[in-house]
């Protein structure tokens, strides 16, 4: 069980024998969104967006967040650092803003104990973070190709929500970087099943998929998902505190087994989106132009490109 491993003020908590949780030390403000998360300062000095066990969406969204963020990290996608956050009963009781709105105008205190935390994008460093970029600026996103990779993960894990991302630009940098957030509605939120549909788990605007020309555009992420090791998935599942799924290990194991079986269906699921009426990949099947190294400048831009 979780226990204090520090002397004096509690800074860290311990789960089982090999997982540490970050202690929350201050509530900063409430965040936008249906989960009613809180921005909190951790004992590690970082800002964390914390989702609580009694959030209005479902208890299991905490498990979903941790599992899918870990999967995305493992296949090489850009996601915020995530961790288990310990929120003390004292902190909740002494932070007037730590409430969760419930039905019919009722309110409840945010749950204390083990919560899910995602590091606040941008942190305390100067820079710029936006949740929308016009199409004209999308070409300046450094990792735009990762939207295809995140689509693979969303289809594999049955994300029943639209894909969400924020765009971060560091101070004195010109280009943005996409960071994929909010994995809570993977595995159909609290359902822990997979009611697949072509337009689920996709970004709302097609231009993030402008570089997709075929299956090669989904690499290396597609191959990494199709070959995702069962042992690695088991390690990820073991990180999830049992309180986040009601302690029913059997249900978690069944969901992980289904996820392993779905690896072979990812191309089919992406193909259903490709063939949908939305036509998300207008460049599919076209060959990208590529520069010819070493050609003289007098050739001009057109002369430097080949099919």
Q: Positions of the model-derived regions?
A:
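Tryptophan (W) side chains
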Residues: 2, 12-15
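Acidic/polar hotspots within intrinsically disordered regions
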Residues: 4-7, 18
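Conserved ATP-binding subdomain of kinase catalytic cores across diverse folds
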Residues: 17-131, 153-160, 176, 183-187, ...
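C-terminal catalytic region of ATP-dependent kinase domains
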Residues: 53, 170-307
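Aromatic-acidic/polar surface patches that form glycan- and anion
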Residues: 61, 142-146, 248
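Catalytic-loop motifs flanking and including active-site residues across diverse enzymes
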Residues: 64, 68, 148, 255
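An alpha-helical support segment within catalytic cores of ATP-dependent transferases
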Residues: 129-154, 170-173
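A short glycine-rich, hydrophobically flanked beta-strand micro-motif that places a catalytic Asp/Glu
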Residues: 160-169
